[in-house]
Every structure is written in C-alpha cells, then in structure tokens.
C-alpha cells in the first residue's frame, strides 16, 4: 500500500522518458535543461541499460565507403547525405554536451579493410557528395601504409575516414547518469513499463519494479526504446538486430590505433587496453539475429575468431576473454524514427546500428517535439 506522502509527491511527473540508453538520457537531459522546474523521470527496465547503449563497440562512425554504397540500394543520394550529416552533427552534439575527456573520445580516424584494391572512382564520388557535410573530403587511400599494420596479406586496400573516432561507452553512460542526477532527473532502474493509458489530462503508466507494481502519471511521455518500441507501437517498421561482440585477453606488444570496419560495415574491431574488441558478422545469419533475445550465435562467433586469427592478427597468439550481445533496431531503410504519436506522446527509435552517432541528437529532437 502507498502512503499519503508517496501518493502526494512521488508518483506525478511533468515528463517521463521510457528507456535509459543514450537517446533516453539525452531526452531527459534536454527537457530538464529547457524546463528546470519540471519534474522529470527516466525509467529503465534493467539495472543497467538493456538495449545497445552499453553493449556497443564505442565507435564514433558515420559509414564506411562500402557501407554507404550498400545504403544507396535503399535510399537516394540526397537522403544518404542528409543521414550522414545527422550522424556527424550527433557526434558533435555529444562531444559538446559532455566533453571529450568525460566520454573517452579519441579522434583516431576510421579505416575500412578492403579485400580488393581501393575503388578510387567510388571514393571520389563519395568525397564529392560528403564534402559539404564534413567541410573537406572525408576519405583517403591509405593502402601504401598497410605494411605498418599487423593485418594479413589478404587485405589489399585501406581507406581512411578522417573524421571518425572512438568513445568509451562505459564512461559515456556513467557521465550521463551523473549529470541527470545533478540536475534533478529521477532515474528509476529495474523498472519496467507494462502498459500505458492516455487521457485528456495525463498519461498513466503501469510499471513494475521487483515484486511491486504501481501507477505513475505524466503530462508527457517519450518512448526511447529502440528495438523494443514495437512492444508498445507494433505498427512501426522496426526489426531487432542482435550484435555479437568479443574481447580478447591482453595482447603483448599490440599497437593498433583507429576504428576498423570490413564487409560493408558489418564487421568491426578496435584496440582497447591492449586488447582487441571485435564484433559483427550479423549478415551471415540475419534470420537468427533478427531477435530480441540476448545470446551467442556459434556460427558468427566462429567466423569472428577465424577473422581475428587469420585476417586481423595472424602473427599474434590471441585468445578470447569474454563476449556479449546487444540489440539494435533496423527497418526498410536506415532513417531513424522520430515521431509525435499524440499531443502527449512521442517516439525516438530505429537507430540502424548508429546509436553512438545519432543518439544524442535524437534524444534532443524527441524532447523538442514535446
């Protein structure tokens, strides 16, 4: 049973955000900064964010050359340029909001490993298309420097992206949660939304935490639940995409700087703390990986380990230390969903595997909608 004090002071809010990942944190942060006296709460069903915000590889990336080429199968060049611009603006907003040191940002560039020689004509095409986004040409041919990398001779080309980098995902989320606490946002972890009911005067949220269920009331609600959004809005074009990440044991003598992609962006790796963090290969078994369930696909894991030993570090003795998975959200195209569902409810979702780049911007946009 609830007390008088709980009923009178702890259940009613001006603005509630569902989902405690990067988008949700920035939605709460943006709204509270714009309305300092508002009562703002953030609900996260896990003790830690459950989606991809703490499960990603920490890449501040905007699309490798072959990935952009693939994207043109599903959208126009103008749409692709616009989306790339949003990704870039998202990283700039993230860095400006929290500071590079607080999020562990490193401007180490991005690199695409090519099994064939670099397509210079393709590179020139995208440099010309994206020059207005970045202020200069983002891509350059670094194939002549391949000998300075530990990769196998199967790699015939190396394309650099001058504006990409990496972040420390743990520091990023930790910084956000601290900032939310400092400005007075109530954060409820381990709290799951079961259902909601909208009326003319409010939105009532039925939630559960542990064995306790109760109703919270809000004037406005932002759903920032990415791949899990169809639980509440099944009509939206959102499919889950599970991503597998492995991290090796420390590797003596490892010197590797940058964020790396291959196979049209599906595979990726980076060095951190003398380890290699690598993931992806979802394209090898998309039907199985179209799931909300966390777990490891043996086929994908075997291929990643093979790539690690034969393609990335063939001259090193490397052992996998541990692994995890995260759930991303995709659709018929890579355009994110930012939508006002009613006067009181808005949705920000479907980040297309680019949550680090898009998350802060989408959080701001969904807060501005309400």
Regions inferred by a protein language model and the residue ranges of each:
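Extreme N-terminal leader/targeting segments of oxidoreductases
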Residues: 1-15, 33-34, 38
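Glycine-rich FAD pyrophosphate-binding loop
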Residues: 32-55
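Glycine-rich active-site loop/strand segments that organize a redox cofactor
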Residues: 51, 55-85
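Flavin (FAD/FMN) cofactor-binding and adjacent substrate-gating region
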Residues: 66-72, 96-178, 183
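A conserved short coil-to-beta-strand element within the FAD-binding core of flavoproteins
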Residues: 186-204
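Central helical "cap/lid" subdomain
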Residues: 207-257
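Flavin-binding catalytic cores
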Residues: 252-253, 290-325
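C-terminal catalytic lobe of FAD-dependent flavoproteins
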Residues: 314-370
